[in-house]
Swiss-Prot record:
GO terms for molecular function: RNA binding. This is Pentatricopeptide repeat-containing protein At4g38010. It comes from Arabidopsis thaliana (Mouse-ear cress). NCBIfam families: PPR (TIGR00756). The lineage of its organism: Eukaryota, Viridiplantae, Streptophyta, Embryophyta, Tracheophyta. The gene is PCMP-E45. Residues 478-554 are annotated as: Type E motif. The keyword Chloroplast does not apply. Belongs to the PPR family. PCMP-E subfamily.
Length: 559
């Protein structure tokens, strides 16, 4: 019988990717008693680590040759499984190996904690933390670093800080681990505060996390400082840092800087394109977002994923570009993009905002797993397109099904009341959101809706009282609603001084508002304010022109 040489078997194992084929090779290894050879064992372990599906079989093989194995083989397998797409297999393999007689060492636990972090295995990780302490490995820096990372990514900031605080020595991995944990769980200020205390040289991963946190809290100066540092150090220039810089500038609404970094990237991936497209949408530059998406399709060779497509759908919704939105919808269906609640919600939002209510309802009813954002998309679309009563009906249905309305939900309800003239219902929803049941604090948009509703109903005095009670200054919508109501009632000269003063800080694009305010101040002999308004008009290049004023336009909105 032909027996292949050891070198041939090594080559066959290296090329092998099938468990069925490997079992045939294994027969030769057993026949020639090569499963005790170090080179063969290393190749076998490498093969078994190629797929999480091999985990059960790997425990059988390793158990059969356990007498000649070192911990290195077990740890190598655990490290391989920890980075696969089935991280729970790592825990299974660890427990199986231990039950078969394997004695863990300090290098065993980092991949196990890494796997626990990937699937948020808090219970499993804490159990193994206890084992680490009992076995005397807790003081090892590699183990402690892996614990900090595990607790951090699982949102257990208190435990992460506890381990970090107990470390006798901290290296760059320790500091980056705690900063990463803060960043991933939304504790951005804590991440930046920790970075400011860092007493070792940061690495690329540190800077990426700090850039993300800087963007989330609007700390542009720190972000720019890191950008300058990256440009001076070639080792820090990478696609990952480039993407983080784009994200930081976008979140700080510095789109020109974001576009410059985007343009300078030698290579762009989906994250690059998505960060830039979603950033343009966030900054209300939807037309540019769609143009950039078109450029991506024609020049990059990158196929859009669900994240990019939801951003494009949002841009279509903002522009009312239903034809482009419909194309994206069809692309999702034909390209095999995984349909989830996020994508379904974006499609409902696009059709609803574009006024295609029947299509929006059809998509909405077809979404099996809805969340509050899905309901908000439908309610908002119904409200702004003249279906106020139906919007309120869906609001009540949403509550009955156990969904908890948020600020956007209540804004949709108030919009529905405003567009339908339901004053009593509007009051009820406005007070309901502030009740103990929901404990939500109205934002400027909610006050604007409520004041608009009251003004349209001729309840100017109640609207003025609400303006006085607002914790924030009024905006253009509120000013327009109040002035419209005053004009209709012929009481322009009776506006309270504090309200008129608050209107002075608002910048308008329409000459009618400035002229009307100027006349009011003139009637009240507030000549300095008259001069101030006229200077503002001159600076902004606004002159009184014939035709409809902002007030008149405002009064005809949604009629």
């Amino acid at each position: 019988m032909y027996l292949p040489e050891k070198s041939v078997l090594l080559e066959l194992i290296s090329r092998c990717s099938s468990l069925r084929v490997f079992k045939q090779i294994q027969t030769q290894l057993i026949t020639r008693d090569l499963l005790r050879d170090d080179l063969i064992i290393n190749k076998v372990v490498t093969f078994l680590g190629k797929s999480a599906d091999f985990a059960s079989y790997s425990s059988v093989i390793l158990h059969s040759i356990r007498s000649v194995l070192s911990s290195f083989s077990y740890n190598t397998l655990l490290s391989s499984y920890a980075v696969c797409d089935k991280p729970r297999v790592t825990i299974f393999a660890y427990k199986t190996f231990v039950s078969n007689g394997f004695s863990p060492d300090m290098f065993t636990f980092p991949p196990v904690f890494k796997a626990c972090g990937k699937f948020s295995g808090i219970r499993e990780g804490k159990q193994i933390h206890g084992i680490v302490t009992k076995m005397g490995f807790y003081d090892d820096i590699y183990v402690q670093n892996s614990l900090v990372h595990f607790y951090g990514v699982c949102g257990e900031s208190r435990n992460a800080c506890k381990v970090f605080g107990e470390m006798p020595v901290r290296d760059v991995v320790s500091w980056t681990g705690i900063i990463t944990g803060f960043t991933r769980t939304g504790l951005y200020k804590e991440a930046l505060d920790t970075f400011s205390k860092m007493d070792v040289e940061p690495n690329l991963a540190t800077y990426v996390c700090v850039l993300v946190s800087s963007g989330r809290v609007g700390c542009l100066s720190l972000g720019k400082g890191i950008h300058g540092l990256i440009l001076k150090r070639a080792s820090l220039i990478s696609l990952e840092t480039g993407n983080a810089l784009i994200d930081m500038y976008v979140k700080c609404e510095q789109l020109s800087d974001a576009m410059r970094v985007f343009g300078e990237l030698e290579k762009k991936d989906k994250v690059s394109w998505n960060s830039m497209i979603s950033g343009l949408v966030h900054c209300e530059r939807s037309k540019e977002a769609i143009d950039l998406f078109s450029l991506m399709q024609t020049s990059s060779g990158i196929k859009p994923d669900g994240h990019i497509l939801t951003s494009v759908l949002s841009a279509c919704a903002s522009l009312g570009a239903v034809d482009h939105g419909r194309w994206v919808h069809e692309y999702i269906l034909t390209a095999g993009i995984k349909w989830d609640t996020h994508i379904g919600t974006a499609i409902v939002d696009m059709y609803a905002k574009c006024g295609y209510i029947e299509t929006a309802l059809e998509i909405f009813n077809g979404i099996r797993s809805k969340n509050v954002f899905t309901w908000n998309a439908l309610l908002g679309g119904l409200a702004i397109h003249g279906h106020g009563l139906e919007s309120l009906r869906y609001f009540e249905e949403m509550v009955k099904l156990g969904f908890k309305p948020n600020l956007v939900t209540f804004l949709a309800a108030l919009n529905a009341c405003c567009h339908t003239g339901l004053v009593d219902e509007g009051r009820r929803y406005f007070h309901k959101m502030k009740s103990r049941e929901y404990n939500l604090f109205p934002k400027l948009e909610h006050y604007g809706c409520m004041i608009d509703l009251l003004c349209r109903a001729g309840l100017l005095d109640e609207a003025l009282e609400l303006v006085k009670a607002m914790p924030v200054k009024p905006d253009v919508r509120i000013c327009g609603a109040i002035l419209s109501a005053c004009k209709n009632r012929g009481t322009l000269m009776e506006l309270p001084k504090e309200i008129l003063d608050s209107f002075l800080d608002i910048e308008f694009e329409d000459s009618g508002v400035y002229v009307l305010l100027s006349n009011i101040f003139a009637a009240n002999r507030r000549w300095d304010d008259v001069a101030r308004i006229r200077r503002l008009m001159k600076v902004k290049g606004i002159s009184k022109v014939p035709g409809s004023s902002y007030i008149e336009k405002f009064m005809t909105l949604d009629q």
